[in-house]
């Protein structure tokens, strides 16, 4: 299974991890300076869940993001799946 959420479309993103040194200006310092940057990946918070589908009358095992899980709690599984199908068409 990929690291992409099938319901929200969230996927890994590329970015940088910054190394800083110095004392912040609000702490009466000279300011924070970036001394290095390293490439890294930001991964979505993926969760494997077993959810009950009332339409199919069975459990569905899905690997979804945490934000998709909140969306399912708010709208219901069938509405979220229908919305994802409409988006992909």
From Swiss-Prot:
Gene Ontology cellular component terms for the protein in this record: ribonucleoprotein complex; ribosome
Alphabetically ordered keywords of this record: Ribonucleoprotein, Ribosomal protein
Positions of disulphide bridges: none
Keyword flag Ribosomal protein: yes
Sequence intervals crossing the membrane: none
Entry's Gene Ontology molecular function annotations: structural constituent of ribosome
Statement: the UniProt record of this protein carries the keyword RNA-binding: no
One GO BP annotation of this record: translation
HAMAP family for the chain: Ribosomal_bL28
Family note: Belongs to the bacterial ribosomal protein bL28 family.
Protein known as: Large ribosomal subunit protein bL28
Lineage, top ranks: Bacteria, Pseudomonadati, Chlamydiota, Chlamydiia, Chlamydiales
């Amino acid at each position: 299974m990929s690291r992409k959420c099938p319901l929200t479309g969230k996927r890994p993103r590329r970015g940088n991890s910054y190394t800083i040194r110095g004392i912040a200006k609000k702490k009466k310092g000279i300011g924070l300076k970036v001394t290095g940057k390293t490439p890294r990946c930001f991964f979505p918070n993926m969760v494997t869940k077993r959810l009950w589908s009332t339409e199919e009358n069975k459990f569905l095992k899905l690997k979804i993001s945490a934000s998709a899980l909140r969306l399912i709690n708010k709208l219901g599984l069938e509405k979220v799946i229908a919305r994802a199908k409409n988006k992909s068409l």
